């Protein structure tokens, strides 16, 4: 068979339909599977009982009667000492199911490979253990099998369990390293470093700080969050402001108020007829703020 036994699932619905599946005959059902070794002592004992000259019909009938077998074994006061070498779970199984206790006594008489019922969770779960008996009370476990419902499985080895866990860990680590590799960038001035996704790109910050730096003072003030002075006519309250012509207005006409600081200021320096250059239109405070902004900006190396 090319398929490994630990990757094989076996079941026989026909056998279950004919005989049923319960704790008394679960070993007989397991003996039909490819996991069972035909040279095991269980098969030898079964053949001996089948072709024995002893009258086994009555014994077989009695084995199917739990009350009769329980009364027979209740007379055996040394049963606990007889099966003292097995674990408490198996000892409870041998005390409850007389068929398995009879098989255990027969297996104690021979040496070699054998199959025993190790655990029961009725009505649909059994654990069968393959072991090698070296003496009546000394056994060596070899393999474990599970019967879940009608399906029979072989338990995986420790090597394959560890191999599967390591393979899963390495797969997740490879995926993580691939994601981290996408977050690495290289700059000749700074070398290899990780990208900071929360920060804005340098080009965006540069554009936001230095856009529209021209000869129009109002635009410069707006981009630097500084007071922006708009010229216009008098508001309805009659507050005196100086327009673009430099002549105070006294009429109660609506106009644009001074923004950002809530204060009105003279804009005579921005008059149309002024002979001053555009550089003189920027005040000393504005130049200082421009200098501080340029010092705080991130340098870009070429």
Curated annotation (Swiss-Prot):
Keyword field: Activator, Nucleus, Transcription, Transcription regulation
One Pfam family of this chain: Med6
Region of interest called Disordered, as start-end residue ranges on this chain: 260-281
Localisation per UniProt entry: Nucleus
Keyword Transcription attributed: yes
GO cellular component, one term: mediator complex
GO molecular function annotation: transcription coactivator activity
GO biological process: positive regulation of transcription elongation by RNA polymerase II; positive regulation of transcription initiation by RNA polymerase II; RNA polymerase II preinitiation complex assembly
Complex and partners: Component of the Mediator complex.
Protein family per UniProt: Belongs to the Mediator complex subunit 6 family.
Reported function: Component of the Mediator complex, a coactivator involved in the regulated transcription of nearly all RNA polymerase II-dependent genes. Mediator functions as a bridge to convey information from gene-specific regulatory proteins to the basal RNA polymerase II transcription machinery. Mediator is recruited to promoters by direct interactions with regulatory proteins and serves as a scaffold for the assembly of a functional preinitiation complex with RNA polymerase II and the general transcription factors.
Entry protein name: Mediator of RNA polymerase II transcription subunit 6
Source organism of this protein record: Candida glabrata (strain ATCC 2001 / BCRC 20586 / JCM 3761 / NBRC 0622 / NRRL Y-65 / CBS 138)
